[in-house]
Amino acid sequence: MTLDLDATKKDDKLLITTIQQEYKILAEYKMIESEKLSGIYVIPSYVNSLQWFGVFFGRQGLYMESVFRFTILLPDRFPDDKSLPTIIFQQDVIHPHVCPYTHSLDVSHAFPEWRCGEDHLWQLLKYLQAIFSDPLDSIRGIEVDKLKNSEAAELLITNKEEYMARVQKNIKESKDHIFDTPPTEDPHYIVFEKFQQDVHGPVLERIKAGRSKQTEPSVQQANGGHATGLSWVKEGEFKPLSIE
């Protein structure tokens, strides 16, 4: 009987800890929403809140017009653990801070360790934006051999034209696969469809008329109260239809 009670207490404690963690992760997502980050979209997986799906749209600098998908993996004890979240791109991305083998982004230069209550995911995403906006500035003051991709760093410093050519190759490859079948059946995976006038035209017109926010509740109601991971891009372009 005593063993059964101990097991029940442990289960209850684990459940409470899990619920508390879920609330903390939800709070992180709400903070990201309130920051209104431009050109970057993320959403937690439907089945695992420790895995997030994201897409980065380059809007300036060398990476302008890039469309890079990435995944964020949160530590098991996030945000209480000092371990850092992991950002992994789904394709080749040449950048001094991106490992050419694992496609993982090194965030340790900005976040030596995760400080619960001080560091937040929106700051991590702002850092991602910053290093792509100005890659040269992002490596200033850092020894080349301490960067994830020292070859990319050397190229950026000594042969910018070749570096830009490789970036353009990455951008083309990312665009070529933007409409690929999703690698997962997770309903929160961010999906892009080619523009269809009969399906997406009315939405585009509402956005142009500035009525998208007013119609949002009815759209969610039609989906059973849940927003979907679906997005649309205009034909011939690789920009999501949004108010921005």
UniProtKB/Swiss-Prot annotation:
SMART domains reported in the protein's UniProt record: UBCc
Domain (UBC core) ranges: 20-176
Any one of the GO BP annotations: sperm individualization
Protein family according to the UniProt entry: Belongs to the ubiquitin-conjugating enzyme family. FTS subfamily.
Name by which UniProt lists this protein: Protein crossbronx
The species this protein was found in: Drosophila yakuba
